[in-house]
């Protein structure tokens, strides 16, 4: 049904006859047919009509089927004529006269031109180029003649023959042009034709001859004296004072200018000490000029290097830091102190520093079934972050301290520090084990440390660890301790302690289940500590010395008396009389 509504090409052929017989107005209307209709007709022609029915170029283009809009891209650019067009050159000729406007280097006769031109000539562009080439050839020929004449005169003078007897031509014009044609061809081939385009100064005799040739009858002689005075005044520079400059007679002072010295006695003859010119003095300093030059070059190089570094740093800001850059990050950055839930309520605060207790285990080791963990202490897999060690000093002891070596404070050895997993209250205050404190001290001193960092405020003495010696290291573990086979004997531990405060309770406040309440008693301490099971950890075999625990606790608590005498009043009186305090007290840093 749609095919009946569309017009076919055969119907268009019939319409073309009527269109051609119609008026011009109807023919113009056929041009304004829409592109959509022409496209639809083309589709119909592809479906029903053969390709030979397509309109040929020689047909009438006024019909609707020949409508083809021109592409904008194929449209040729219209050439716009230039606004300025040169069709010819007009040359004006001026007669020569005495100038009185310039100062030649020699002589007193200057060249100038009259106010009105004497001739006018018009050339086309090609003709003017030819005229310029001809004038240059003529100038070059004249110069070659002058050179030839000068050469002949020099030969005669060298031979001692007078010019009158030799019969040489007195002027350049007397020389034949044919004699210099060969030299002219060589000069043109050598590029001397371009040298003629530059103006060359004429000597005084040549200037005088040009003026007389142009019709000048009288040459002013006064101009020669004026030009000589001008040249002398320009050559005269500086004052003529002899080492001492008098303001009343100094030419620089009278002229109102400063005295100047480029080198010794030039242009001014006065010295620095004898110059009394009120206007001042200027001296040329080679060292100052060289220094300024070097400083300028250095500044330019620094600016260039900074610019190149900025360009290299800009693309690197978006990329992740390299391992080398991460190693440059400080090991203990300033950060906020950790909260209780992060450290398992094992952190204490003081008025000076923040300390935290953490324990860690070697990666790849699993916890043995017979090694229970305490909820109050961090697990063996706890890894303290960098921010947790913000304002704390790391306290550890190396094996080199056991031999009586000096205490060394090492920076940047956090990777070698071990978490003090053996630090547990059951080993210190255990009631069932009388030697718990000594065993904890001995186990702490016998731990395998590769490097240590001692707190300078702890006042610890390494000599208290010499009693055990190195012989006990071959005996095995301490009595009452078990070493699970699954645990690595080389696993290290460390503790973060701050002993810069003078308070004796800060070390004990870091222990779990320790709270300073109003009804706190020593019995409660014993009961609470008995319920805590001591963790199992590897210990080197050292014989428990008798003085090691007392010396270590004495150094920790800051007591001058022996530890045996100071431990009882410490537990009986100081634990009961302590004011209530929380485990975590925020202290502004």
Curated annotation (Swiss-Prot):
GO molecular function: DNA-binding transcription activator activity, RNA polymerase II-specific; DNA-binding transcription factor activity; DNA-binding transcription factor activity, RNA polymerase II-specific; sequence-specific DNA binding
Compartment(s): Nucleus
Record region (Disordered): 1-62, 309-388
InterPro entries named among the record's database cross-references: CSRNP_N (IPR031972), Cys/Ser-rich_nuc_prot (IPR023260)
Tissue expr: Ubiquitous. Most abundantly expressed in lung, placenta, skeletal muscle, pancreas and leukocyte. Frequently down-regulated in lung, kidney, liver and colon cancers compared with their corresponding normal tissues.
Alphabetically ordered keywords of this record: Activator, Apoptosis, DNA-binding, Nucleus, Transcription, Transcription regulation
A single GO cellular-component term on record: chromatin
Residue spans of biased composition, Low complexity class: 17-41, 345-368
A biological process from GO: face morphogenesis
Family: Belongs to the AXUD1 family.
Known function: Binds to the consensus sequence 5'-AGAGTG-3' and has transcriptional activator activity. May have a tumor-suppressor function. May play a role in apoptosis.
Protein name: Cysteine/serine-rich nuclear protein 1
Organism: Homo sapiens (Human)
């Amino acid at each position: 049904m749609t095919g009946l509504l569309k017009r076919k090409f055969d119907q268009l052929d019939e319409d073309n006859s009527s269109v051609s017989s119609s008026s011009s107005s109807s023919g113009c209307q056929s041009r304004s047919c829409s592109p959509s209709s022409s496209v639809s007709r083309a589709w119909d022609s592809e479906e029903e009509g053969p390709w030979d029915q397509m309109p040929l170029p020689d047909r009438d283009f006024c019909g609707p089927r020949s409508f083809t809009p021109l592409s904008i891209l194929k449209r040729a650019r219209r050439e716009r004529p230039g606004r300025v067009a040169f069709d010819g050159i007009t040359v004006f000729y001026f007669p020569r006269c005495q100038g009185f406007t310039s100062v030649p280097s020699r002589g007193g006769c200057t060249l100038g031109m009259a106010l009105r031109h004497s001739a006018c000539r018009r050339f086309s562009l090609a003709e003017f180029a030819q005229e310029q080439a001809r004038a240059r050839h003529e100038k070059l020929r004249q110069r070659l003649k002058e050179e030839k004449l000068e050469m002949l005169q020099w030969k005669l003078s060298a031979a001692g023959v007078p010019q009158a007897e030799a019969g040489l031509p007195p002027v350049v014009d007397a020389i034949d042009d044919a004699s210099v044609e060969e030299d002219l061809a060589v000069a043109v081939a050598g590029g001397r034709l371009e040298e003629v385009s530059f103006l060359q100064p004429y000597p005084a005799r040549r200037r005088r001859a040009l003026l007389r040739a142009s019709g000048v009858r009288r040459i002013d002689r006064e101009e020669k004296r004026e030009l000589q005075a001008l040249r002398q005044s320009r050559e005269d520079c500086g004052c003529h004072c002899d080492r001492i400059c008098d303001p009343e007679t100094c030419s620089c002072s009278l002229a109102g200018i400063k005295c100047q010295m480029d080198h010794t006695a030039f242009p001014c003859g006065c010295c620095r000490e004898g110059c009394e010119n009120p206007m001042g003095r200027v001296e040329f300093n080679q060292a100052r000029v060289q220094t300024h030059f070097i400083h300028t070059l250095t500044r330019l190089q620094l600016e260039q290097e900074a610019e190149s570094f900025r360009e290299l740093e800009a693309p690197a800001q978006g990329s992740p830091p390299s391992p080398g850059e991460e190693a440059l990050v400080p090991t203990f950055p300033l950060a906020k102190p950790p909260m209780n839930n992060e450290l398992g309520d094992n952190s204490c605060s003081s008025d000076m520093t923040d300390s935290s207790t953490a324990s860690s285990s070697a990666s790849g080791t699993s916890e043995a079934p017979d090694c229970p963990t305490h909820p109050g202490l961090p697990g063996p897999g706890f890894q303290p972050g960098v921010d947790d060690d913000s304002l704390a000093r790391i306290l550890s002891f190396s094996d080199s301290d056991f031999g009586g070596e000096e205490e060394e404070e090492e920076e940047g050895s956090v990777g070698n520090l071990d978490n003090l997993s053996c630090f547990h209250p059951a080993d210190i205050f255990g009631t069932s084990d009388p030697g718990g404190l000594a065993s904890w001290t001995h186990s702490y001193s016998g731990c395998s440390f590769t490097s240590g960092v001692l707190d300078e405020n702890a006042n610890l003495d390494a000599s208290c660890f010499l009693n055990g010696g190195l012989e006990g290291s071959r005996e095995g573990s301490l009595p009452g301790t078990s070493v699970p086979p699954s645990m690595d004997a080389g696993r290290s531990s460390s503790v973060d302690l701050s002993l810069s405060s003078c308070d004796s309770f800060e070390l004990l406040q870091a222990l779990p289940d320790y709270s300073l309440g109003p009804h706190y008693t020593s019995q409660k301490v014993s009961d609470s500590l008995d319920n805590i099971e001591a963790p199992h950890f590897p210990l080197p075999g050292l014989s428990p010395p008798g003085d090691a625990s007392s010396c270590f606790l004495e150094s920790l608590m800051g007591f001058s008396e022996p530890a045996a005498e100071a431990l009882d009043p410490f537990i009986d009186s100081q634990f009961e009389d302590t004011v209530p305090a929380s485990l975590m007290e925020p202290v502004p840093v």
